[in-house]
Amino acid sequence: HVTTYAVIVLAILYLNDKGLMGYVNDNHLHDLGKFMFAFSIFWSYVWFEQFLLIYYANLPEETIYFLERWEGHNKIYKTSEILMVILNFLLPFLVLMTRDAKRTRIFLKIAAFLIIAGHYIDFYQMIMPGVVGKHGGYGLVEFGMVTVFASAFIYVISGELTKASLVAKNHPFLPEALHHDI
């Protein structure tokens, strides 16, 4: 999933900035950027294909999914739906298009944060219109839950990273991975 690659990129860049992963070079980052770019495009394909499948198969009982998000509940979800497509497809596509952008740390960080935010909105859009309807919206509870779970995730992962070596020293392909070149 593209969010996983976004989190991996952020973790690697953070550890590299702290000097714990000095062996990660621009070629490694380029490959991770390619994965983020590819899975972002794949997400867009699957999302649009869902719409096309409902439209071309003439499944009126399924159109409620899109109708509820575009026209229903006083159109409170329409802005989020548009923002979701921009954050998950358009901006990562534009940011990660060039080879140099996939090798530049700030562009990778920007794209990773955009993708994570976009996928939060994606999951929100899947659940909230059908569950709470017109009473939905972004408030303290939504941002609080993201903060709590992100903090717990960072706490657990940072605790686990202190317990093990970040390099598998006896792995047979380690020399090849350290000298990764594109």
Where does each model-flagged region fall?
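Long, contiguous internal "core" modules enriched in hydrophobic/ aromatic residues
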Residues: H1-E81
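Hydrophobic cores of alpha-helical transmembrane segments in multi-pass inner/ER membrane proteins
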Residues: H1-L13, I86-P92, G144-E160
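Extramembrane terminal tails and long inter-domain/linker segments of multi-pass membrane proteins
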Residues: L20-D26, F149-I182
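Hydrophobic, well-ordered secondary-structure elements that form the walls
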Residues: Y45, P92, F123, S165
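Membrane-interface transmembrane-helix boundary segments in multi-pass integral membrane proteins
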Residues: E61-V85, V132-I157
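Extended C-terminal subregions enriched in glycine
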Residues: K78-R105
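Extracellular/periplasmic helix-loop-helix junctions in multi-pass membrane proteins
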Residues: A101-R105, M126-V141
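Central hydrophobic cores of alpha-helical transmembrane segments
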Residues: F107-A117
